[in-house]
């Protein structure tokens, strides 16, 4: 999404560069493979929207009914909203770019998609990192004074941290508008032929790109890896302690801890894959229509959907609500026929 094709500039027409587009790059994929990729992407978008919509609806209903929501529920609401918006945006973009390329290539439309994509991705990364951070502070068993003080204040800090992440993501997305531009060269000669071939060249602001990835991707990634790893170590130590005291594996507290670490472990794998795919995709390492670029899109679309499904499976409250919803959907046709 960061790369767009423009014709070579002349000194007289530098001001017109932003509105003169090259023809789309020739696709390296067969029509069947393109159709398959589009079908997979659309399926992932729909699954992600449904799963995150369910999580958001459950916690939003709790928020309205009780006039309050738990700290983890608040984080999940922010995370679900950002993912629903991101999945909807990506689905809308792929639809418009496939059906109306001229409209999609207009400056206002293109940059609206570009800024929104970066903003929502960074929000999702930060919210997920804060979810891992919250689990670490509430579940990990450390006795350091600073850690205990942080645990005592975490409930009041989370709302400020969430809104700070929104501000950072928005500011950063506006800063990164002109990091990378792709130009096309129509005069590259083909040997043993009188024809020319269209090539695509990237112009990248290296300093801006480094700042872009360090603040937007690497920082929340490092925070997530550290908190998840420390949480795993803490729970392992707790497991060994319970085993030595012969408490048993059916301790409710232990089961809750193991359920949380299981969810975090799966989330860690998905988070790393998504961050790497996002890094590659935004770096324009591959051609827009290449298989690798499309693979990155598939991974980025699969991440919100798969993690939301894991959250529903591993969270007792969400799992019960999902079963009740399935039961109602199963009984609804029978009630309608009666």
Swiss-Prot record:
One GO CC term on file: membrane
BP-aspect Gene Ontology terms: detection of chemical stimulus involved in sensory perception of bitter taste
Extracellular topology ranges: 1-30, 96-116, 178-205, 284-291
Primary location class: membrane
Cytoplasmic side: 52-74, 138-156, 227-262, 313-338
Range of residues in the leader sequence: none
Membrane topology: Multi-pass membrane protein
Glycan attachment sites: 185, 194
Keywords: G-protein coupled receptor, Glycoprotein, Membrane, Receptor, Sensory transduction, Taste, Transducer, Transmembrane, Transmembrane helix
Pfam family, one: TAS2R
Tissue spec. comment: Expressed in subsets of taste receptor cells of the tongue and exclusively in gustducin-positive cells.
GO-annotated molecular function: bitter taste receptor activity; G protein-coupled receptor activity
Transmembrane segments: 31-51, 75-95, 117-137, 157-177, 206-226, 263-283, 292-312
Cellular localisation: Membrane
InterPro entries linked: TAS2R
Family the UniProt entry places it in: Belongs to the G-protein coupled receptor T2R family.
Function, in words: Receptor that may play a role in the perception of bitterness and is gustducin-linked. May play a role in sensing the chemical composition of the gastrointestinal content. The activity of this receptor may stimulate alpha gustducin, mediate PLC-beta-2 activation and lead to the gating of TRPM5.
Protein's name in the database: Taste receptor type 2 member 39
Provenance organism: Homo sapiens
